[in-house]
Amino acid sequence: MAFNLKNRHLLSLVNHTEREIKFLLDLSRDLKRAKYAGTEQQRLKGKNIALIFEKTSTRTRCAFEVAAYDQGAHVTYIDPTSSQIGHKESMKDTARVLGRMYDAIEYRGFKQSVVNELAEYAGVPVFNGLTDEFHPTQMLADVLTMIENCEKPLSQISYVYIGDARNNVGNSLLLIGAKLGMDVRICAPKALLPEDSLVEMCQKFAAESGARITVTDDIDTAVKGVDFVHTDVWVSMGEPLETWGERIDMLMPYQVTPELMKRTGNPKVKFMHCLPAFHNSETKIGKQVAEKYPALANGIEVTEDVFESPANVAFEQAENRMHTIKAVMVASLA
């Protein structure tokens, strides 16, 4: 079957079929191999891409910029301090301006409704670099990383996301696993599980793909036999430190420790994290948390000994952001 993803948005993966997602993963693999072999061909020469960042980023910005440069495209980085977006100009008007100058627009920010509005009015492909609800480029990188680190067929790979499951990573891992027919498990305190509406939508996708979905607060049920353990930060950096106490108390049993990794019963289990991770007290935030909560001096959502172990494939994930983002741009713009 021939695929035509030309001029397609990437907003959440909700509207991408299983075969379209697999096509992007295959293209990511091919582009990665070409880069490693020195045989990459530039297919985006003459293309201009706007990168709108209302939230700061290291991996997403670098991945988009390097992917674009590798393919011969040019990018313009737009941050909140250097634009009129939201201050003197609406996103609707911004979309109609940038759509006349650029071949595509990336957006990283807050509400999903904003990137949807951008896509509605820009007239060019729009790529979601992260919103509060979804993180689709991260999911493509995550699945590529799991494929590379597991000999099983995709449909037999099992993974758990453990921690605060109401965020964009928890939502998106549930979604892509359901789309691709995987064994996906979401584990969190009951108050921090995904919204019922999202779970119901993903169960419908799972019925079509053959995916197995588990959403639970029971750790042993969730981690048993999994190939990969995912987590993410427990709190957003915009939240005051004083408000972390209740969240930390709730999530402490869900911290990824060597003991939790052993509870999987899989000696080959791998650890995954979208990064940045608070795995020690060397960062400013990590130090502040450790001073207030000494039990977290060795890491918040994951401990230092897990993060620095051979089980950690988070840096492969980070690299794969670039290869998968490149695939999204090539599929849409080449």
Curated annotation (Swiss-Prot):
Its EC number is 2.1.3.3. Pathway: Amino-acid biosynthesis; L-arginine biosynthesis; L-arginine from L-ornithine and carbamoyl phosphate: step 1/3. Reversibly catalyzes the transfer of the carbamoyl group from carbamoyl phosphate (CP) to the N(epsilon) atom of ornithine (ORN) to produce L-citrulline. InterPro entries: Asp/Orn_carbamoyltranf_P-bd, Asp/Orn_carbamoylTrfase, Asp/Orn_carbamoylTrfase_sf, Asp_carbamoyltransf_Asp/Orn-bd, Orn/put_carbamltrans, OTCase_ArgI. The keyword Amino-acid biosynthesis applies. Keywords: Amino-acid biosynthesis, Arginine biosynthesis, Cytoplasm, Transferase. SUPFAM superfamilies: Aspartate/ornithine carbamoyltransferase (SSF53671). It is an enzyme of class 2 (transferase). It catalyses: carbamoyl phosphate + L-ornithine = L-citrulline + phosphate + H(+). This is Ornithine carbamoyltransferase. The keyword Transferase applies. GO terms for molecular function: amino acid binding; ornithine carbamoyltransferase activity. GO terms for biological process: arginine biosynthetic process via ornithine; citrulline biosynthetic process; L-arginine biosynthetic process. Gene3D superfamilies: Aspartate/ornithine carbamoyltransferase. Its main location: cytoplasm. The gene is argF.
